[in-house]
Amino acid sequence: METGGRARTGTPQPAAPGVWRARPAGGGGGGASSWLLDGNSWLLCYGFLYLALYAQVSQSKPCERTGSCFSGRCVNSTCLCDPGWVGDQCQHCQGRFKLTEPSGYLTDGPINYKYKTKCTWLIEGYPNAVLRLRFNHFATECSWDHMYVYDGDSIYAPLIAVLSGLIVPEIRGNETVPEVVTTSGYALLHFFSDAAYNLTGFNIFYSINSCPNNCSGHGKCTTSVSVPSQVYCECDKYWKGEACDIPYCKANCGSPDHGYCDLTGEKLCVCNDSWQGPDCSLNVPSTESYWILPNVKPFSPSVGRASHKAVLHGKFMWVIGGYTFNYSSFQMVLNYNLESSIWNVGTPSRGPLQRYGHSLALYQENIFMYGGRIETNDGNVTDELWVFNIHSQSWSTKTPTVLGHGQQYAVEGHSAHIMELDSRDVVMIIIFGYSAIYGYTSSIQEYHISSNTWLVPETKGAIVQGGYGHTSVYDEITKSIYVHGGYKALPGNKYGLVDDLYKYEVNTKTWTILKESGFARYLHSAVLINGAMLIFGGNTHNDTSLSNGAKCFSADFLAYDIACDEWKILPKPNLHRDVNRFGHSAVVINGSMYIFGGFSSVLLNDILVYKPPNCKAFRDEELCKNAGPGIKCVWNKNHCESWESGNTNNILRAKCPPKTAASDDRCYRYADCASCTANTNGCQWCDDKKCISANSNCSMSVKNYTKCHVRNEQICNKLTSCKSCSLNLNCQWDQRQQECQALPAHLCGEGWSHIGDACLRVNSSRENYDNAKLYCYNLSGNLASLTTSKEVEFVLDEIQKYTQQKVSPWVGLRKINISYWGWEDMSPFTNTTLQWLPGEPNDSGFCAYLERAAVAGLKANPCTSMANGLVCEKPVVSPNQNARPCKKPCSLRTSCSNCTSNGMECMWCSSTKRCVDSNAYIISFPYGQCLEWQTATCSPQNCSGLRTCGQCLEQPGCGWCNDPSNTGRGHCIEGSSRGPMKLIGMHHSEMVLDTNLCPKEKNYEWSFIQCPACQCNGHSTCINNNVCEQCKNLTTGKQCQDCMPGYYGDPTNGGQCTACTCSGHANICHLHTGKCFCTTKGIKGDQCQLCDSENRYVGNPLRGTCYYSLLIDYQFTFSLLQEDDRHHTAINFIANPEQSNKNLDISINASNNFNLNITWSVGSTAGTISGEETSIVSKNNIKEYRDSFSYEKFNFRSNPNITFYVYVSNFSWPIKIQIAFSQHNTIMDLVQFFVTFFSCFLSLLLVAAVVWKIKQTCWASRRREQLLRERQQMASRPFASVDVALEVGAEQTEFLRGPLEGAPKPIAIEPCAGNRAAVLTVFLCLPRGSSGAPPPGQSGLAIASALIDISQQKASDSKDKTSGVRNRKHLSTRQGTCV
């Protein structure tokens, strides 16, 4: 997209608000050649100018320093904008402008245009002058922000262009920019933008009586001799057309060998028989393709249309219906002679209303037209089926019979084909479309011509998503319909364009997903030529919140190879002008594609012809097989033939490039098994419910859709409206998420299967018919009525699971009379889903069972006979959510308030007075039919409902009639710049001027561009033309537009103000509704007539006031901080003493100053009748107050109904108030105090003693247990006695018997586990003094232990050393540790 601003070339000078004037340097009636730049210069100029202007405007500095008031003047550092301009730098248009100069510019401003803006320009020339508009730059949000161009001075004049999106030079630097022409001498341009996103806007040059496009630089602008005020182009040689923009006889047509140039006739090349092309440069046949624009006769603008349909019959292209700006001269039926290039108008006597978005299909001499939107009938989508007979030129209508439980959908934006099935039945197949009731339909509809019946068949294969504005072609070879693109509702409540390609096999009713094109679009065309589907044009805009440059109108040219499942991009038409469009039609004759009409800001009436290469031109086998793109050829017996004409004998098929399996990322987009496996991308369905590449590893995969189990979740997700969701009993509509969800499987119960709209159960028990029926009845069901193919397939699959026994179950089919069989649900047996076996039904049987033979079928049997099995059926138990009725569809809501009552679900178009689904706004108004839409607030639907001139001129179809008082009073009327208008027919185009509605002779003044200077709403005269002198009639405001405080009403346009009725509890009320702003907290109601009893407020505001009832001994806090409390200046309280022998204390404080009054009363009517209360306290401007009321003084005992009233007033918002009433003794009772104190102290002491005693007991118990464990452990240790000989000097102890021999021995050895180490324990004699005795206080002996290695000792030694150790117990078993 182009991001630059609008360039003003030359030396522009401001001419009027909203226009910039530039005088051309050359003559010729204001031509523009002197300042035209090439495309690259435009882009560069736009970029620099945009950056410079944006750098100024975006800075929030005083305008005196920056000088950045774009359309205004700087006064006191503030921009004062010229009329029609707004913004802090006056940079956005917002209003109406009148341009009277012979040429000039108009623009929306220097930067991106404003959100939610409406701007209108009236260019006024003189009657019947030719006015030309050239769009040097145009960039708006496609399909949402539009510029409307009318050939006249109001929106009731003929509409000639609706511009939207990006319109800039695209292919060549010298490419001509679009030009729009009006012939009335006036042009009204109205621009509307919504609140989504904005772009750089537009720069439009206009000129009056100038040559078209300045003769495109290929001619001279000349003044007409007969009419001096008119000019025309004298074209240079080899250029023709009104603007000299059509080249002819290039290279002199290759004369004389190839052809010659016809200079006297139509000025084109006349080729010799062996040459073709616009310049006779291609052979016949040719290996190259080319485009041409034939000379059409007559070339009437009324032929132009979009969203029409065309079919080919012989040499005639029949065009029926379509959208046009003006239906008054619209021809419903046209035919175009493809040989002579002549249009003819069909003149049937009677027929259908004009429509667009319908379908056409040809069968023999009849053209079948179905559905579409009837623009002249409130925009309703119809389900009418009309037949046009070509021979008799007459219409007839058909009313088909809908079979079964099907539905006939009224749709638009669908497609249709008629073919003969293998069953010899001729069927018209209607594909997808949008229904105003059921949303985007994904169903196939069949119309059987011979039986005049309608059917919605069940399809197999992939689960596809239907939409609006797709294209489809039927291929006789594959017996399939190929469907591409469209505008669809997508998951997650999203919607947009798609590039999907589906194949529908008409005989097997199977869907397959093919390779997508990579270029999303809708309202394009598609034809089938030589095995290739050619896609041309369409709307490719798919932006949401940010533009990425996608164009509304495309000239993209794509080719799909059916045999190889490959897409190719073909070159765009290389013609002398743009051919971008959408909403066109295309047919094929003699291998050439003819494109007609469409929309590209204007309604197109031209014919484009595409001549593809001819297979016969290829002489080589390899060249033949590799021909393309856009053509498919086969080699047959040494010559090349087209894909369709070749027979099956001796044919060498074309080569296809090898296909590789898709990546996992590509396969992840398929969320169900059927779509994953019924496509050509090479995917497989893995056991963990995920679609992955066929080359990826998977433990258990499904590669054929016939093995898939259809999940209701995937079917329900494709249903885009509550109505369509409710038709499928397996689905339910979630109102909060606004999506269709599958019903849970447990709705049937354990042992049952949820199939379609029923629960089925197969049992193998052997019963007769009556007992089988009783069995099902006990399960709250009945014998099954198998009326759908899904139910039959399920039962057959269940029967096959019984491998150990033969199951032939009873079904709910019995003989009603001698020739009639019926199901148990009273539906007739149609012999379609199930059939009788050969020889059946026999005369002896009155009940039927299902026999599983080589071919499954029914057999008749006596009802008393036994059968092996039965099939039960019961209805689905629907949850509460599904029981909720759907809301009224948007298309059935007839008022703005009803349409916008449910948030963003619906959108109201005020100009067409239609309500549409939010996800279908684009397709409901594909050609900008809606001038303005609303989703919340509703404006008056007619001009008469607008009360002020400012409101009136905001609507492009209204004008203001100012009354003679010149005080701002008047009335708003539909009108034009010349005066008011009135409606004489049903459509707004049937408006005529009626100046009597605002008679000038009676001093009424008509205002269309700007309001009269004095706008005092009839309540004051003006001084200095625009200043209200003194507002009267209880009004105030700069324009006396508001009521004075204390009054309400709508004083605009002479309205009255009424005093507020607030029961004395408010001084002001809402200015318009009169709802009182009550000043006392707790009083509510429109007239302050109620107390807020739900929040403890009591009283009667009609006779007094309201009080908050306080509880004694509680503190209450009132935070008046919310916006709803802004008007509160008072709050009242009441309190009743609870004890008659205690004083009543009051405490009140607040965050702001307040006035306080306290009264008391014993009467029951106090608070409502003055004089009943006695004043106690009256304080002003305080923040805190405390007091005590004596029970003796006020005699609480004798006055049990005594009530204290507290009035807090005159405070400011916001405020926080705390108040409390309490009753307690004033003199402390010492006896009671000490009794209470000692009671508490002794209780606490007792508790402490008990806790201490419990603690001591627990401690003693734990100590005893610990000692016991220690004694047990000590008692379990090993022990022994040992003799010790002590020597003191040389003496021997007396009691030793015998001498000591050998070395000293240990007193103990404790071997470790493994007997490789031990702990040795010995006695040691400590050093002694000279006396041989140890020092005083010390022992002479000590015990020492050491770890020793005993692995090298002899066994005998070890035995000796350990012989003294006895009673050894609990030796450790852990290696390397001692005991």
UniProtKB/Swiss-Prot annotation:
Residues in domain EGF-like? 53-91, 207-245
Domain of life of the organism encoding this protein? Eukaryota
Q: Which residues cross the membrane?
A: 1231-1251
> What ranges does the Cytoplasmic topological domain annotation cover?
1252-1379
The entry lists its GO molecular-function terms as: carbohydrate binding; Notch binding
- Annotated GO CC locations: membrane
Stretches assigned to the Laminin EGF-like domain: 1014-1059, 1060-1108
CUB domain residues: 93-209
Xref: InterPro entries: Attractin-like_CTLD, Beta-prop_ATRN-MKLN-like, C-type_lectin-like, C-type_lectin-like/link_sf, CTDL_fold, CUB_dom, EGF-like_dom, GBD_ATRN
Q: What's in the keyword line of the UniProt record?
A: Disulfide bond, EGF-like domain, Glycoprotein, Kelch repeat, Laminin EGF-like domain, Lectin, Membrane, Repeat, Signal, Transmembrane, Transmembrane helix
Chain positions covered by the region annotation Disordered: 1-23, 1354-1379
A single Gene Ontology biological process assigned to it is: G protein-coupled receptor signaling pathway
Ranges where the PSI domain occurs: 614-657, 666-709, 715-760, 889-939, 942-1012
Q: How does it sit in the membrane?
A: Single-pass type I membrane protein
Under PROSITE patterns, the record lists:
C_TYPE_LECTIN_2 (PS50041), CUB (PS01180), EGF_1 (PS00022), EGF_2 (PS01186), EGF_3 (PS50026), EGF_LAM_1 (PS01248), EGF_LAM_2 (PS50027)
Tell me where the signal peptide lies: 1-52
Positions of glycan attachment: N76, N174, N198, N380, N763, N778, N898, N1157
Disulphide bridges in this chain? C63-C79, C81-C90, C93-C119, C211-C221, C215-C233, C235-C244, C776-C872, C1014-C1022, C1016-C1028, C1031-C1040, C1043-C1057, C1060-C1069, C1062-C1076, C1078-C1088, C1091-C1106
The C-type lectin domain, residue ranges: 755-873
Q: Where's it found, cell-wise?
A: Membrane
Classification via PANTHER family: ATTRACTIN-LIKE PROTEIN 1 (PTHR46376:SF4), LEUCINE-ZIPPER-LIKE TRANSCRIPTIONAL REGULATOR 1 (PTHR46376)
The UniProt function text for this chain reads:
May play a role in melanocortin signaling pathways that regulate energy homeostasis.
Q: How does it assemble?
A: Interacts with MC4R.
Q: What is this protein called?
A: Attractin-like protein 1
> What is the species listed in this Swiss-Prot or TrEMBL entry?
Homo sapiens (Human)
Gene name for this UniProt entry:
ATRNL1
